[in-house]
Amino acid sequence: MPKMKSNKSVAARFKLTGSGQLKRTRPGKRHKLSKRSSQQKRNLSKQPLVDQGQVGMYKRMMLV
């Protein structure tokens, strides 16, 4: 049986922390930032944690 492949799009979007939680990036930080305030852009840089109800699904997709 061949090796299982991880979902590359999920692996690129999420980072696994040391405690087993997943960090994600916020959307809206790529282009057209001139209309946003400095505070908005700074808050978009923060990486929130994924909700606990979805962590298991994403970990299975990442083969962790």
UniProtKB/Swiss-Prot annotation:
Residues 23-39 have a biased composition (Basic residues). One of its GO terms (biological process) is translation. Gene3D superfamilies: 4.10.410.60. Residues 1-55 are annotated as: Disordered. InterPro entries: Ribosomal_bL35, Ribosomal_bL35-like, Ribosomal_bL35_CS, Ribosomal_bL35_sf. Pfam families: Ribosomal_L35p. Keywords: Ribonucleoprotein, Ribosomal protein. One of its GO terms (molecular function) is structural constituent of ribosome. One of its GO terms (cellular component) is cytosolic large ribosomal subunit. It comes from the Bacteria. Belongs to the bacterial ribosomal protein bL35 family. PANTHER family: 54S RIBOSOMAL PROTEIN BL35M, LARGE RIBOSOMAL SUBUNIT PROTEIN BL35M. This is Large ribosomal subunit protein bL35. It comes from Chlamydia trachomatis serovar D (strain ATCC VR-885 / DSM 19411 / UW-3/Cx).
